């Protein structure tokens, strides 16, 4: 199936949602998608383009440096966000882990697509066995109580919204491969939202 709208508008359609045959084929009575639609990407931001320009010189190498794999991974699709490359030189294997630009884990089609792209003979050295995977999730919970100044009681609803936004921002910030769970960053963001004091039970060091 091909989405008629550009960008990510066609992502997230559940299995079975795509069932209309546009170009009829002999002996094909019906069709249906078996996985959620994905891979559609919006135009990359200026920051993402600047990062690819910075990594571009690494693409000239055919020796398989880290910068080359980073560049090609981000070139594959504008939705590719954080990328980490690891290698076992003795085994000749290269492992590429990545997240989408919103911090979420990629779906199986995205993983397979990037792996096939990086395994192209024009990209990988002949001695490299490239494997692409989504990183393992690290689960954590958020449990906190915040207090505001009595003089700010008329702003309680606005502060509540700001605190919720601060928590969401922290969750997005935390979605980086290899980044430690940092409670101090959460407390810092919640305090900046207008709180007087924060008691943070989880996450904890």
State the predicted function of each range.
Residues 21-24, 28-34, 135, 174, ...:
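Surface-exposed loop/turn and secondary-structure junction residues enriched for glycine/proline
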Residues 160-205:
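An aromatic-glycine-centered, glycine-rich loop/turn in mixed alpha/beta architecture
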Residues 1-58, 64:
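Catalytic P-loop NTP-binding/switch module of NTPases
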Residues 58-179:
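Carbohydrate-recognition loop of C-type lectin domains
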Residues 6-14, 133-135, 139-141, 172, ...:
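Immediate N-terminus of the mature polypeptide
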Residues 4-8, 24, 34, 101-103, ...:
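Generic structural motif
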